[in-house]
Structures are given as structure tokens and as C-alpha cells.
């Protein structure tokens, strides 16, 4: 239940829900009820004013299986995935293990803070074989949350080059 190791205690309601689930003694298939979907769609509506459909939501047991699934679903043999580095190593492994070339856009380390080299990123995104960009936010291992401006710039570059994020 994590994207990266975290150094704060998990919130009590989450711990209580996990303990309650464990005490049931039943660990079969998960069933996603309407209230789960409503919680997700409601959060996106409240937080971002996005109207998302229940059918758009897919569940994954973790980021690593999701990366492999995305690679197989959205990128064909001979195409490429753009990634920043440094990054959590399974990002690159998901491309490698699925026979896809990873294009590395190196982050700039400015006084201990990672920043995106947008000039280099844009050049690499312009390669017609680059079909997807794996966005890691918060950035792991650096822990940086990309700013709204940075995310919008990534989005614009990817949209202009038909690169799925």
C-alpha cells in the first residue's frame, strides 16, 4: 500500500480498516462495491473538478504490476517509453522485461533538488517512436512533487507529440 517508503505513521482509520479486514479471516477475491467507485470518482470531482466514469477505473495490486501492464497494453514492439532518471528502478525494468526501449531523460540536480531538463525532454518526446511517458510523482528517489507549471509543461509537450502519460 505504498509508492515509496514513507517515514510517517499510517493514519489510524487506515490501520483500523486493515485490522478489521484481517480479523475477518477471509482473504479471497476482492469485490469492489459501488461505494469504492463513488469514493474515487467523488475525490477526483472534489479535488480536481474532474468527472470520471466508473468504467475508467482499473485496480492493480501495486505500481510494478501496473507498469508492466501499461507497457504491454500501450506500447508495441519497436516503440519506446520516455522516463526521467533517476527513478524507481522498476520503471526501467518494466520496459526492458517487455522488450521495449526506455528513453532516458536525465533530471538535473540543482543544489540537491531534481529538476526536469525540459529542452532535452522535449527533444526526446518528439521522437515518433516514443509512445508513452512514465511520470513518477512524487519523484522517487528525490521525493519532489512536481509543480503545477511543470506538470502542465509535461502535459503540453506530451500532447503535442501524441505521447501518452
Predicted region positions:
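N-terminal "arm"/small-domain region of PLP-dependent enzymes with the aminotransferase-like
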Residues: 1-28, 163
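Low-complexity, intrinsically disordered or weakly predicted helical/coil tracts enriched
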Residues: 16-17, 123, 129, 164
Amino acid at each position: 500500500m505504498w509508492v515509496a517508503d514513507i517515514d510517517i505513521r499510517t493514519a489510524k482509520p487506515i490501520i483500523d480498516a486493515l485490522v478489521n479486514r484481517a480479523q475477518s479471516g477471509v482473504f479471497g477475491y476482492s469485490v469492489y462495491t459501488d461505494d469504492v467507485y463513488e469514493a474515487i470518482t467523488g475525490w477526483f470531482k472534489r479535488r480536481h473538478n474532474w468527472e470520471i466514469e466508473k468504467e475508467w477505473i482499473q485496480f492493480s495490486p501495486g505500481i510494478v504490476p501496473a507498469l508492466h501492464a501499461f507497457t504491454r497494453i500501450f506500447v508495441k514492439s519497436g516503440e519506446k517509453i520516455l522516463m526521467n532518471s533517476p527513478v524507481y528502478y522498476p520503471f526501467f525494468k518494466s520496459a526492458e522485461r517487455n522488450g521495449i526501449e526506455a528513453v532516458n531523460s536525465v533530471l538535473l540536480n540543482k543544489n540537491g533538488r531534481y529538476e526536469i531538463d525540459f529542452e532535452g525532454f522535449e527533444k526526446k518526446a518528439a521522437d515518433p517512436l516514443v509512445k508513452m511517458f512514465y511520470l513518477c510523482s512524487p519523484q522517487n528517489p528525490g521525493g519532489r512533487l512536481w509543480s503545477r507549471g511543470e506538470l502542465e509543461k509535461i502535459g503540453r509537450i506530451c500532447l503535442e507529440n501524441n505521447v501518452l502519460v
